Design a protein with these regions (language model features):
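Phosphate-binding loop of NTP-binding sites
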Residues: 1-117, 121-130, 164
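Adenine nucleotide phosphate-binding catalytic loops in nucleotide-utilizing enzymes
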Residues: 93-94, 127, 131-173
Length: 173
C-alpha cells in the first residue's frame, strides 16, 4: 500500500498500519522517510516474514513519485488530497495532481486506487477511463465509501459510521 498527497500522508500511513498490524505482520515507512532515499531504505527491510508494507511517497516535482512507484509496485494507492505544497515548483494544483497521480503509473487491473472523495481535483478523475478499480472515500455523497457521525475521542481514537452502498458499519479506531 502506497500513500501520497499534499497533507496527511504520515497520519494516514500510521492509521492504515495500526489497523492492518492488528492482524498481519506489516512493515511501514519510518517517520516521514518518504523520498527517493528513505522509501527504498524501508523496502530493503522487507523480507518474507512481512505480509504487507505501508509506504509513504513524497515529492517536490514531476517524476519523483513515478520513481518510487516503479520501485514499490504497490497494489493499493492512496491519495489523501491535492493542496498547495510545491506549487512554486509545479506551477498549479492541476500539475500537483498530475505529479501525485504518478503513484498509479504501474497499476494493473488487480490494483485499487483510493482517493479523497472530498477533494475537487481528485474527483475529476473518471473511473471509466481507468484499467484498475477506483474508490472514492469521503464525507460527502460523492464518495463510494462515506464516513458520517464522526466523533474524535482524543487519545482514545476516532469513531464513525461507514456506508458502502447499502451496507453500514460502526467503526472505532
Amino acid at each position: 500500500i502506497s500513500i501520497t498527497g499534499s497533507n496527511g500522508k504520515t497520519t494516514t500511513k500510521d492509521m492504515i498500519y495500526a489497523v492492518l498490524s492488528s492482524k498481519y505482520k506489516v512493515l511501514k515507512t519510518q517517520g516521514n522517510f518518504n523520498n527517493d532515499i528513505g522509501m527504498p531504505l524501508t523496502i530493503f527491510n522487507l523480507d518474507n516474514s512481512y505480509q504487507m508494507a505501508v509506504l509513504e511517497m513524497g515529492m517536490s516535482g514531476f517524476g519523483e513519485i513515478d520513481r518510487l512507484a516503479r520501485i514499490a509496485r504497490p497494489k493499493v494507492g492512496v491519495i489523501t488530497n491535492i493542496g498547495l505544497s510545491h506549487i512554486e515548483k509545479l506551477g498549479s494544483q492541476e500539475n500537483i495532481l498530475k505529479a501525485k497521480m504518478e503513484i498509479l503509473n504501474y497499476f494493473e487491473d488487480d490494483c485499487i486506487a483510493i482517493l479523497n472523495g472530498d477533494d475537487r481535483l481528485l474527483l475529476s478523475i473518471k473511473k471509466e477511463k481507468l484499467p484498475f478499480r477506483l474508490e472514492y472515500v469521503g464525507t460527502t455523497p460523492n464518495a463510494d465509501i462515506v464516513a458520517e457521525n464522526i466523533v474524535i475521542k482524543g487519545e482514545e481514537g476516532i469513531a464513525y459510521d461507514m456506508h458502502m452502498g447499502d451496507t453500514s458499519y460502526n467503526i472505532s479506531l
